[in-house]
């Protein structure tokens, strides 16, 4: 029986043939994909592929507004649109 930490179904299982000829079950973590932009779906630059739990604090997310949620181009378009809308409301 595997230990409780390895019973989670969120981990992948892989059958490995041992030198003795028997099959053993290895439990491995799933690979993570790059975070994607919420608008265009492109990978966000400056964000690592690991989970934030595994990374140190200085590497986790960009410090710009919406960092780790929007890519730089969508953020630029959104800021320009909000400035344009606020300017048109004042007129």
Curated annotation (Swiss-Prot):
Similarity remark: Belongs to the eukaryotic ribosomal protein eL34 family.
Which species is this UniProt entry from? Thermofilum pendens (strain DSM 2475 / Hrk 5)
Identify the InterPro entries for this entry: Ribosomal_eL34 (IPR008195), Ribosomal_eL34_C_sf (IPR038562), Ribosomal_eL34_CS (IPR018065), Ribosomal_L34e_arc-type (IPR047868)
A GO BP term, please?
Answer: translation
Q: Which GO terms describe its cellular component?
A: ribonucleoprotein complex; ribosome
Q: Does the keyword Lyase apply?
A: no
Keyword terms of this UniProt record = Ribonucleoprotein, Ribosomal protein
Can you name this protein? Large ribosomal subunit protein eL34
Provide a Gene Ontology MF annotation, just one.
structural constituent of ribosome
């Amino acid at each position: 029986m595997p230990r409780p930490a390895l019973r989670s179904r969120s981990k992948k299982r892989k059958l490995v043939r041992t030198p003795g000829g028997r099959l053993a079950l290895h439990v491995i973590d799933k690979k993570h994909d790059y975070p994607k932009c919420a608008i265009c779906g492109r990978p966000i630059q400056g964000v690592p592929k690991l989970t934030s739990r595994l990374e140190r604090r200085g590497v986790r997310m960009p410090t710009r507004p919406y960092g780790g949620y929007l890519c730089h181009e969508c953020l630029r378009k959104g800021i320009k649109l909000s400035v344009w809308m606020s300017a048109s409301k004042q007129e």
